[in-house]
């Protein structure tokens, strides 16, 4: 829909959690749109639970993940999609912004499908995280590979090898003590760029009409201003 209303935007703002270079002169790569609760010192694990954000296509990994958590004396808090049969140590959590944030900030580690926004938050707070991209989701596979290369506390789980031993092996490769890139909140920068763009557009409206701005974030969709 945004491409329909703004097929050739004068300015494109793309939110990513990685230090990427734009490939067009009218494109700007911004940091993730961080929620206020996320900052570098926000992660405070309590030794009580693991958090998972999963969708139907990757739920076959759940038994091994829940068993691993159980062996280590942890509850598994599950967000997203749920299976018909839920292991005893799994708590199916309803969709809740505040609940998810609190559980994420206090979890020992997390597992997720490598969405851009969530990976940006993971990169910001430094929580150990395992990515399981959904089958056929090329963007998630790219996100997972970039996150694994960028952050010492992010690993990728092989889609066909899920066991307690494999999870132990993956988690053993994660480092929470190594230096990691500083993730900047992209929301303020986005607002400043939009304000500058609109001010310039107003000043030049009599001679140079603009086609709009395209702001791209994965989980929150695309937004256009024209």
Annotate each language-model stretch with its function.
Residues 1-58, 81:
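A nucleotide-sugar donor-handling region in carbohydrate enzymes
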